Each structure stands twice: as C-alpha cells, then as structure tokens.
C-alpha cells in the first residue's frame, strides 16, 4: 500500500516567523549537551537547512536525508526507504513524522535505531490552541499580544496527525 506524503517546499523560500525561529532554538536546545564536535548525525527532513547548517558550523558531521530534492539533501529518499549504510552517533527528525501516516513512524525508528550509537531526537507538533498574534506600534510604544483560541481541527493541510489530536496520544507515540 502506497501512502500519501503531505509536504510542500514552498515555505522554504519565505522568511520564517518568530514561532519557526523558536522551533529551531528548541531543536538545538534538545541536542545541547548530547551532540559534540566530531559526532556523526543523520537528519531526516531538513526543512530550510538551518539545523544541519548550525550543527556543521559546530563541527558535527551531518548527513541530511529528505524526500524533496529541491532542498538539496545529501541523500534524496523517503524516510521509510532510508537505511543507514553505517553507524551514526545521533539521529534527528524535527517536525517530520506528522507528514506521513502515524503507524509508519515506528518502523522508521526501528530501522534507524539499529545504526544509532547514542541518541534519537524527535519533535512533532502538539494539537493545541491556535495563537493569534497582534502587534501594536504607536510612535515609540510597541506591544506584542498573543491570544489563544480553541482549535477544533488540524489546520496545516500537510499534516496527517498531531500529538493529542483524537487518539494520537503521548502514550501511543511512545509505544
């Protein structure tokens, strides 16, 4: 059975939002203290390339894998078909698994963990309230306000699922 991939590379040609930059910060923070110079790391789903470029600037040997050749990954491959040809210290997939069927995530991680010596880092979106940001600027006064409204459905058309949406619980994710 061939599954549908929901992704788009259109967003990588635009400037990122504050929330997207915060996401990068959280990705790096998650790896802080675990990933060191000269470590090897596989990144599946490279997005804009920020994380891999940052890690390379810190002398981490990064192998990038993405389904979208326009993003110029080291290897063009669907995550379900990628099998590392050697062992790596770390693996990361940030905001990737929600773009495929939930059940595929387990087989991908099982496939990868055989070749990872240290850590697997993953992040997925959490189904929560939708933030509405307002920015007010009057002369020298500036104020940013965020208001959260209840979210009733997945808004991103490229997501199959999000954590805590319907039966996609943390418990199910960790099993």
Q: Which residue stretches match the model-derived regions?
A:
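Conserved N-terminal segment of class I S-adenosyl-L-methionine
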Residues: 1-92, 106-109, 115, 152-171, ...
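Alpha-helical membrane-targeting segments
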Residues: 19, 128-153
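Short, flexible active-site-adjacent loop segments at beta-strand->alpha-helix junctions, enriched
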Residues: 68, 126-128
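Hydrophobic alpha-helical membrane-insertion segments
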Residues: 75, 104, 132-134
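Short catalytic micro-motifs in class I SAM-dependent methyltransferases
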Residues: 95-99
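A short, conserved alpha-helix within the catalytic core of class I
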Residues: 100-111, 124
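Conserved beta-strand signature within the Rossmann-like core of class I S-adenosyl-L-methionine
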Residues: 117-126
């Amino acid at each position: 059975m061939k599954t549908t991939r929901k992704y788009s590379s259109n967003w990588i040609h635009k400037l990122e939002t504050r929330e997207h930059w915060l996401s990068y910060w959280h990705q790096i923070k998650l790896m802080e203290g675990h990933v060191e110079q000269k470590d090897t790391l596989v990144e599946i789903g490279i997005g804009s390339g920020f994380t891999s470029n940052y890690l390379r600037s810190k002398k981490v040997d990064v192998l990038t894998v993405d389904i979208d050749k326009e993003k110029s990954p080291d290897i063009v491959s669907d995550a379900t078909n990628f099998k590392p040809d050697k062992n790596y210290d770390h693996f990361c997939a940030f905001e990737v698994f929600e773009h495929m069927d939930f059940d595929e995530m387990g087989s991908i991680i099982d496939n990868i963990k055989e070749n990872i010596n240290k850590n697997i880092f993953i992040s997925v979106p959490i189904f929560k309230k939708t933030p509405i940001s307002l920015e007010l600027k009057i002369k020298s006064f500036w104020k940013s306000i965020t208001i959260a409204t209840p979210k009733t459905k997945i808004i991103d058309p490229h997501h199959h699922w999000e954590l805590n949406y319907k039966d996609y619980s943390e418990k199910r994710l960790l099993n």
